Swiss-Prot record:
Residues 1-325 are annotated as: Regulatory region. Residues 271-287 have a biased composition (Acidic residues). This is Mitogen-activated protein kinase kinase kinase 1. Keywords: ATP-binding, Cell membrane, Endosome, Immunity, Innate immunity, Kinase, Membrane, Nucleotide-binding, Phosphoprotein, Plant defense, Serine/threonine-protein kinase, Stress response, Transferase. Its EC number is 2.7.11.25. The gene is MEKK1. One of its GO terms (molecular function) is MAP kinase kinase kinase activity. GO terms for cellular component: endosome; nucleus; plasma membrane. Residues 333-587 form the Protein kinase domain. InterPro entries: Kinase-like_dom_sf (IPR011009), MAP_kinase_kinase_kinase (IPR050538), Prot_kinase_dom (IPR000719), Protein_kinase_ATP_BS (IPR017441), Ser/Thr_kinase_AS (IPR008271). It is found in: Cell membrane; Endosome. SMART domains: S_TKc (SM00220). Activated by cold via CRLK1-mediated phosphorylation and leading to elevated kinase activity towards MKK2. ATP binds at residues 339-347, 361.
């Protein structure tokens, strides 16, 4: 305890003693040693020398670094000046060349190779007598243009029995002279001035500034070598053998057979030829049924071919057209305005060299990817089918032509467009719908009798001419029906028949599917809107698959309603054929008489 108290006293004493400690004495100028002999000038000079030495050493060290080979421009002041100084120029003007120097450089670079050979008149050399031939088979001749080149006197002895070429000057020409020494020693002399010669060896005829010596020349290159290489042969495109190639199909769309022109024989012989060709076409149509394969979905989804809409007019020559009987020959034509878009591409108006108007379906086959093969097959089927159809209610096919990557299909021009555009402009009354329906039935009957199914009957695919004639168009999905075995789901959903949607539950579908689509088309013309218009396409598919009929308004006439409901039978076996529907009262009614021009009665086509 005593020890602890003693330590506490000592620590307290230390703390108190710290306050009495005197601070360290500060150094002041008066305490510095006085140097009376101090010279400020000498001190400043010595310090300047030391500074210069240190600066020079730093500069010497900085020069030891390698010069920069790349520069980074950060936008600072003076960066470009440092780059110019490192390049040894004062500014950007030193990097430029004059216009005259540039033009001279271009002329020199383009004429170095070409003009060198133009200076030699090869045609004249062929007509001249060439000099004698040495043992190596090399023939040396002089050129008509003698450009003298400085040389040197070369004299050396060749082996025994050799032939040496000696150049002798006659006027302005230098001609080779072969001289054989009597004792077998060959002497080779060359004058100081020589001219370029034409050397012909192994099929080459090239200019050469070197005199060819047969044998016995010591040193250098032995024999003759032309100064330029023989150009390679022209490259040829490899033949297209791949069966899946788009170009292979494209080249076969417009066959190169002899163009069929109208014969000058009598009308009776023409009728006989037409009958024979018609029988051949029917036989080909039957054979096509076994070769057709299922095609892709609708054109809007799978076959949206591209086109150049900006090109309003262009002239295209028809390279290899094919023509049906009675069609005019189209040798040259011009593409006009865009009329619309079909299953495979854009449709334009065209005019031939004879002033005949027609429709041109332009198909591009380049950027289709995986869908190209399917669309090409679909297009090939349409062309083959159209070439066999000859009916007043079906669009007439007039031939094909190709131009680069595009295929052009020439069709009959129907001026008023589709029924879709027509009922959007006018209100179609029952009398007009009845007239149009009868013509549609005539075309369908012709197709079904031929064994074809259209598979896409709707107002957008039915065209109207100025005289009121209705024509079926867009046969991109049409198929040959054989034993009711069409099992693919094609067409637009709103016009599809139930058996087309429920193809798994049936063996396929045939011509009754077109009758269902016809009923939907008549309903569309009467109401001015598509069937199932209040549903989405997927919802419409489910409704149709379950057998739900589209709504038929009570405002329609009784004959029109009965005709539509007769077509829209869920069971395809209960639907009438096209021939039976032609006897229906709706299509057999007479047209009401339109009032005379003075009565002022409205046209039945005019929308009120």
């Amino acid at each position: 305890m005593d020890r602890i108290l003693a330590r506490m006293k000592k620590s307290t004493g230390r703390r108190g003693g710290d306050k009495n400690i005197t601070p360290v004495r500060r150094l002041e100028r008066r305490d510095a040693a006085r140097n009376i002999n101090y010279d400020a000038a000498s001190c400043s000079s010595s310090s300047a020398e030391d500074l210069s030495v240190s600066t020079s050493s730093l500069m010497t060290r900085s020069l030891e670094f390698p010069e920069p080979t790349s520069f980074r421009i950060g936008g600072g002041v003076g960066e470009m000046d440092r780059i110019y100084r490192s390049l040894g120029v004062s500014g950007p003007d030193d990097l430029a060349i004059s216009f005259d120097a540039w033009e001279a450089c271009k002329k020199r670079s383009s004429s170095d190779v070409v003009n060198r050979f133009k200076s030699f008149d090869l045609d004249k050399v062929r007509d001249q007598d060439l000099s004698e031939e040495g043992p190596s088979g090399v023939v040396v001749g002089s050129d008509s243009m003698n450009h003298k080149v400085q040389g040197q006197d070369l004299s050396e002895a060749g082996p025994s029995g050799g032939i040496v070429t000696e150049l002798s000057e006659i006027g302005n020409l230098i001609t080779p002279v072969d001289r054989l020494v009597a004792d077998g020693v060959v002497e080779n002399r060359r004058v100081m001035e020589r001219t370029p010669t034409i050397v012909k060896s192994k099929g080459y005829l090239v200019p050469n500034n070197v005199v060819a010596v047969g044998v016995g020349v010591g040193g250098g290159i032995k024999g003759l070598r032309p100064p330029v290489l023989k150009p390679p042969p022209a490259m040829k495109r490899p033949p297209i053998d791949h069966r899946g190639s788009s170009w292979d199909f494209l080249t076969h769309f417009a066959p190169s057979e002899t163009v069929k022109r109208p014969s000058s024989s009598s009308s009776s012989s023409e009728d006989g030829c037409d009958e024979e060709e018609g029988k051949e076409e029917e036989a080909e149509a039957e054979e096509m049924g076994a070769r057709f394969i299922q095609l892709g979905d609708t054109a809007d989804e799978t076959c949206s071919f591209t086109t150049n809409e900006g090109d309003s007019s262009s002239t295209v020559s028809n390279t290899s057209p094919i023509y049906p009987d009675g069609g005019a020959i189209i040798t040259s034509w011009q593409k006009g305005q865009l009329l619309g878009r079909g299953s495979f591409g854009s449709v334009y108006e065209g005019i031939s060299g004879d002033g005949d108007f027609f429709a041109v379906k332009e198909v591009s086959l380049l950027d289709q990817g995986s869908q190209a093969q399917e669309c090409i097959q679909q297009l090939e089927g349409e062309i083959k089918l159209l070439s066999q159809l000859q009916h007043q209610n079906i669009v007439r096919y007039r031939g094909t032509a190709k131009d680069g990557s595009n295929l052009y299909i020439f069709l009959e021009l129907v001026t008023q467009g589709s029924l879709l555009k027509l009922y959007q402009r006018y209100q179609l009354r029952d009398s007009v719908v009845s007239l149009y329906t009868r013509q549609i039935l005539d075309g369908l009957k012709y197709l079904h009798d031929k064994g074809f199914i259209h598979r896409d009957i709707k107002c957008a695919n039915i065209l109207v001419d100025a005289n009121g004639a209705v024509k079926l168009a867009d046969f991109g999905l049409a198929k040959v029906s054989k034993f009711n075995d069409i099992k693919s789901c094609k067409g637009t959903p709103f016009w599809m028949a139930p058996e087309v949607i429920n193809r798994k539950d049936s063996d396929g579908y045939g011509s009754p599917a077109d009758i269902w689509s016809l009923g939907c088309t008549v309903l569309e013309m009467c109401t001015g809107q598509i069937p199932y218009s209040d549903l989405e396409p997927v919802q419409a598919l489910f409704r149709i698959g379950r057998g739900t009929l589209p709504e038929v308004p009570d405002t329609l006439s009784l004959d029109a309603r009965l005709f539509i409901l007769k077509c829209l039978k869920v069971n395809p076996e209960e639907r009438p054929t096209a021939a039976e529907l032609l006897n229906h009262p709706f299509v057999r009614r007479p047209l009401p008489s339109v009032g005379s021009g003075g009565s002022g009665s409205a046209s039945p086509l005019l929308r009120r």
